[in-house]
């Protein structure tokens, strides 16, 4: 399988997960805007660092691959919100944390 096919497979897996979670949570990710999504991305990065550094997975059935898929989806969610806000998309306004 070449890299393009690998990417398609990853994106399909991520889309399936997004559809399932969207059915459960709806548009909740948009509640706190881009900053909220960035905070969730930070949580997932810290989780991935913990898993790789300590080799410990404290959440059953959610390993490094699952965390990477979540990061993929959170990045897509942030892009959705950026597309909805042209000023931020064009970097014409500052985003304060």
Where are these regions (language model features)?
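Intrinsically disordered, low-complexity regulatory regions
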Residues: 1-97
């Amino acid at each position: 399988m070449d890299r393009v096919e690998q990417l398609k497979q990853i994106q399909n897996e991520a889309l399936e997960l997004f559809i399932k979670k969207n059915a459960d949570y709806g548009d909740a990710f948009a509640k706190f805007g881009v900053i909220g999504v960035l905070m969730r991305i930070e949580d997932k990065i810290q989780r991935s660092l913990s898993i790789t550094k300590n080799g410990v997975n404290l959440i059953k059935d959610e390993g490094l691959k699952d965390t990477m898929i979540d990061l993929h989806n959170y990045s897509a969610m942030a892009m959705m919100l950026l597309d909805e806000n042209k000023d931020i998309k064009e970097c014409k306004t500052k985003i304060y944390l």
